[in-house]
Amino acid sequence: MPKRLDINTILVIGSGPIVIGQAAEFDYSGTQACQSLKEEGYKVILVNSNPATIMTDTATADKVYIEPLTLEFVSRIIRKERPDAILPTLGGQTGLNMAVELAKSGVLDECGVEILGTKLSAIEQAEDRDLFRTLMQDLNEPTPPSEIIHNLDEAYGFVNEIGYPVIVRPAFTLGGTGGGICHNEEELIEIVTSGLKHSPVTQCLLEKSIAGCKEIEYEVMRDSNDNAIVVCNMENIDPVGVHTGDSIVVAPSQTLSDREYQMLRNTSLRIIRALGIEGGCNVQLALDPYSFQYYVIEVNPRVSRSSALASKATGYPIAKLAAKIAVGLTLDEIVNPVTQKTYACFEPALDYVVSKIPRWPFDKFESANRTLGTQMKATGEVMSIGRNLEESLLKAVRSLELGIYHLELDHLKELDKETMKKRIIKADDERLFIVAEAIRQGVTKEEINEWCEMDFFFLQKVENIVNMEREVKANVGNMEVLQIAKEMGFSDHYIAAAWNKTEREIYDMRKENNMMPVFKMVDTCAAEFESATPYYYSTYADENESIVTDRKSVVVLGSGPIRIGQGVEFDYATVHSVWAIKEAGYEAIIINNNPETVSTDFSISDKLYFEPLTIEDVMHIIDLEKPEGVIVQFGGQTAINLAAKLEEHGVKILGTSLEDLDRAEDRDKFEAALTKLGIPQPVGKTATTVEQAVAIAEEIGYPVLVRPSYVLGGRAMEIVYRQEELLHYMKNAVKVHADHPVLIDRYMVGKEIEVDAISDGENVFIPGIMEHIERAGVHSGDSIGVYPPQSLSEKLKEQIIEHTIALGKGLNIVGLLNIQFVVFKDQVYVIEVNPRASRTVPFLSKITGVPMANVATKVILGQDLVEQGYGTGYHPEEKEVYVKAPVFSFAKLRSVDTTLGPEMKSTGEVMGKDLTLEKALYKGLVASGINIPTHGSVIITVADKDKEEAMEIAKRFHEIGYNLLATAGTAQSLEEQNIPVQVVNKIDSEDYNLLDIIRQGKAQFVINTLTKGKQPARDGFRIRRESVENGVACLTSLDTTRAILRVLESMTFSAHSMKEITQTKRHEVVHA
């Protein structure tokens, strides 16, 4: 059936900010979909609240709205634009839930808008646990024994009948939010309560636990003609019981017999047909390892994380084709863009193995519960490709950016058998490493299988790796052993340590012996047809398929997996850089390993290498391609950290030189540069021992800011208020020695300002200055940023511009730089300079219309700013106000403290824009998920140091009609100021207390500031966690609270009695 001609305008709904469970994969799918629809000649309108994406670039759609994804704002856009149809299935769970809400509100009928792709009835049938279960029964498809529940009593009824353990799956939620496995009554109460709270329809499915079965996924496509194909099937190495987003996954499945494969394939196709899904769909199944009994777990009637993985694993662009199917095209009409010869109805075939390993945020949140279950905790993932599973797995391990080069972790070597058993049974983020350690220590595969039901095939592969380690150690210098180790994916780093040589020596040894990898193409058809994709992976085999052209080329290093501190913003910069390289006439080559992102879409660059970002893997590509140079500025800290080693190998670093990069990163050199330029900075020194640290802190005076040098996202950064906290930090957070010094700075309580600039060495151009709402001390990534600055005097602005220009020239920056200033007592100090793209680049690029990464890349390639139409100075400010608000994923990470400080905790960001600061703030806060009711109750419990400041805030809350609740200490201070307050019991009280109020939803806001430094102030911690678990906005910064008050005050009509008004007037007359 040809494409539909009865519709012209399509509204695409994006997925909003990055949170755990919904990351960069929707930037990739949304971008593909918009381009795909434009190719077909439709007018595309996009709404999304996330400014950090390629998707929200003005070029992606005909009209782009960066607005909150709420019923209020999306309805407004529909009424204004009057689209013929909406396409929600590419916006993740957010998009689906929005479609359901829009349909129920009546706005789609009112405006005559239809839902494209998967129909509303199919979405509801797949997402509503009750409807789905009924459909499976009609199809005779087995599901685990289960019960739909709406309250705790119903849950007890089911458990009494079936027994523990049971799995709780909330309806219409993302990444298993609120769900989990219950082994006893205590867990049942906690998880069911949380699940019902997180489900927008207050519904959970309780099912008998089938943990231990194999978890298999099928990624399926269907069109309106009922053509249906399997794009890819995948197998979780972790059995059922761990969320698929937290599982290590391989494609294609490795342990299924042909009969099992066909049986599950037929089931998947039968389900997608019964649901009537048009587009992409993900089916999750459980298979009993000892029989042919299987169960259907769930269906995602949309493009998902798994479909991004399947697209990158096969080269088959699911989202692009799903968009074409949505407008009526069929699979047998669409040409496969990879082969450009076959049609999209050919099922992809793989002649390699793909591994995906999740990237968790536990390096940031040491206190988080690391146990994995049905609620997802990973922020991102890496993917790798190899010719055998061992190679594929080891490449994925070294892609994780955790400083790991092999399937072993030093700290696990001390574990005894009992501890290993416990951790393997319970499953945490290190389980695969513990399995390898257990095998090293002689535990049998049979025992491990008994503990965790991981398939023998996978255990055998881990054992093969361990056996090879022994071979490597026993045969130092043996070239045959080296060859086999390399074919299994062993890194030079590991072999060098085993052979007591340097990594470079092993690399050179292989080069002399012609032991270098070749590059194979990902072509969707196992080389059956000729293919046009420039998409490659390395392996040790015979024929090299990556043909080097005679064009001049430039390599861009990507930023690896999405994690806190290094999000999709860096991918945005990478993609823009690649486009600029192509515009400048060079061949653009990208190296990256994140399957979720736009940068790893093979249509973006001239060549894509899907490889780990380690010196060895990058050098293999550079040796083959011999580029003009490498750009490291856009890949975050990942790429910057490779610069020195690349230069040692004789590779040219384009842009800011290594020496100048080091001058901005190395404390002493940076101080010297600032002194020379006459730019002030907070007093600070470097310590290489604990004693030195104590002495420096005494000399500077507390509070001090402590951090290791060379970090991203404020990792292990803290503000400490006294000596015992400093000693606690030195002992627990960092291992200080001469190579890893600790920086100690005077902590200045001032206004923080952030600037992004582009320098060509002569000229420095400043697209924008941003002011942070939270004072210095809250990480810039967790602060609310405002552009243009609202409270900076012209004099201070000029100081900031002068310092920025001086730093750009003085540090010889070529390309981008990001500077953080603090304004303290009317004086501007520099906190830090990052000689690279920062996380604010996409935000400022969109607002100012200056494509910063693009301009910077052209500067790096030799085209100065004046040639590009920019000069030195500050870009004229926009009239509207723009707010960048952080988004957190605390609900997914139990036992993480939500207090904001110098260590970054947010996973994503949203933008609000309007004519006034209050309106822009309102949009930003609402888009970030904070509910802003105009009346209600606010609980105030603040540290003594904040009491005075909190009084003014409490008074303003009272004036707009809020009830104030406080514990005795804070209440007394309020009463002294004649502010009405209701005293509530502290949390250790047996009676009705503060936590009960939060649990019962009787408070709209909780204001809670951290008492003293970091030693766990348990009460405060429990208050903050309880707020998160119950969806109550918990404000840990008084600056954020003030921002919310501004919004509330602007929404509230003032109500003063006539007497008050006349008294004021009389007062004025007297003065006249």
From Swiss-Prot:
Keyword set, alphabetical order: Amino-acid biosynthesis, Arginine biosynthesis, ATP-binding, Ligase, Magnesium, Manganese, Metal-binding, Nucleotide-binding, Pyrimidine biosynthesis, Repeat
Catalytic activity: hydrogencarbonate + L-glutamine + 2 ATP + H2O = carbamoyl phosphate + L-glutamate + 2 ADP + phosphate + 2 H(+)
InterPro entries in UniProt: ATP-grasp (IPR011761), ATP_grasp_subdomain_1 (IPR013815), CarbamoylP_synth_lsu (IPR006275), CarbamoylP_synth_lsu_oligo (IPR005480), CarbamoylP_synth_lsu_oligo_sf (IPR036897), CbamoylP_synth_lsu-like_ATP-bd (IPR005479), CbamoylP_synth_lsu_CPSase_dom (IPR005483), MGS-like_dom (IPR011607)
Taxonomic path: Bacteria, Bacillati, Bacillota, Bacilli, Bacillales
Binding site for Mg(2+) 3: Q820, E832
Protein name: Carbamoyl phosphate synthase large chain
Pathway: Amino-acid biosynthesis; L-arginine biosynthesis; carbamoyl phosphate from bicarbonate: step 1/1; Pyrimidine metabolism; UMP biosynthesis via de novo pathway; (S)-dihydroorotate from bicarbonate: step 1/3
Chain spans, region Carboxyphosphate synthetic domain: 1-401
Binding-site residues, Mn(2+) 2: E298, N300
Residues spanning the membrane: none
Domain observations: The large subunit is composed of 2 ATP-grasp domains that are involved in binding the 2 ATP molecules needed for carbamoyl phosphate synthesis. The N-terminal ATP-grasp domain (referred to as the carboxyphosphate synthetic component) catalyzes the ATP-dependent phosphorylation of hydrogencarbonate to carboxyphosphate and the subsequent nucleophilic attack by ammonia to form a carbamate intermediate.
